[in-house]
């Protein structure tokens, strides 16, 4: 399944993986997964975290390595019920709930994830997604960005 991913997608997932893999040991533990999810405003229980790991933990060692992470991401991309997931992700970014993601909101979430971006990088991300050129990302633009990769 992961063999249907492009080089670019794999590179992006590698970056995402390293955000989760806080200690850089090449695996994601339930603790690391919990840290990232909480920084995104979610509040998963220990059991939920364990379930999420078990779902993709092919070798059963209790952690997720990069190949397992890739499989999980490939599966998620194929999921058609991702509409709700995308809406949820949009809500995470849209802090004030006004239906738009501003550069400040994007910077805030990325910083919470431990991804320190320069103002230029944040502006570039907004520009890439901002089809109508109003300087912020609305839901439709966000959906396009998430699904057209």
Curated annotation (Swiss-Prot):
Family: Belongs to the calmodulin family.
GO biological process: microtubule cytoskeleton organization
SUPFAM superfamilies: EF-hand (SSF47473)
Record key words, sorted: Acetylation, Calcium, Metal-binding, Methylation, Repeat
Transmembrane segments: none
Positions contributing to Ca(2+) 4 binding: 130, 132, 134, 136, 141
An annotated GO cellular component: cytoplasm
Record function comment: Calmodulin mediates the control of a large number of enzymes, ion channels and other proteins by Ca(2+). Among the enzymes to be stimulated by the calmodulin-Ca(2+) complex are a number of protein kinases and phosphatases.
Record's protein name: Calmodulin
PANTHER family membership: CALMODULIN LIKE 3 (PTHR23048:SF0), MYOSIN LIGHT CHAIN 1, 3 (PTHR23048)
Superkingdom per UniProt: Eukaryota
Positions with a binding annotation for Ca(2+) 2: 57, 59, 61, 63, 68
N6,N6,N6-trimethyllysine PTM sites in chain numbering: 116
InterPro entries membership: CALM/Myosin/TropC-like, EF-hand-dom_pair, EF_Hand_1_Ca_BS, EF_hand_dom
Domain EF-hand: 8-43, 44-79, 81-116, 117-149
Note: This protein has four functional calcium-binding sites.
Sequence positions bearing N-acetylalanine: 2
Amino-acid positions noted as binding Ca(2+) 3 in the UniProt annotation, renumbered to this chain: 94, 96, 98, 105
Positions annotated to bind Ca(2+) 1: 21, 23, 25, 27, 32
């Amino acid at each position: 399944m992961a063999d249907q991913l492009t080089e670019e997608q794999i590179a992006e997932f590698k970056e995402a993986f390293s955000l989760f893999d806080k200690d850089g040991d090449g695996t994601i533990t339930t603790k690391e997964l919990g840290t990232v999810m909480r920084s995104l405003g979610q509040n998963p229980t220990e059991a939920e975290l364990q379930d999420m790991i078990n779902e993709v933990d092919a070798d059963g060692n209790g952690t997720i390595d990069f190949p397992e992470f890739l499989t999980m991401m490939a599966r998620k991309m194929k999921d058609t019920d991702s509409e709700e997931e995308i809406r949820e992700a949009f809500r995470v970014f849209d802090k004030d709930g006004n239906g738009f993601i501003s550069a400040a909101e994007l910077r805030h979430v990325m910083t919470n994830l431990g991804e320190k971006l320069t103002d230029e990088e944040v502006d570039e991300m907004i520009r890439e997604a901002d089809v109508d050129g109003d300087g912020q990302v609305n839901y439709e633009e966000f959906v396009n960005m998430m699904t057209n990769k």
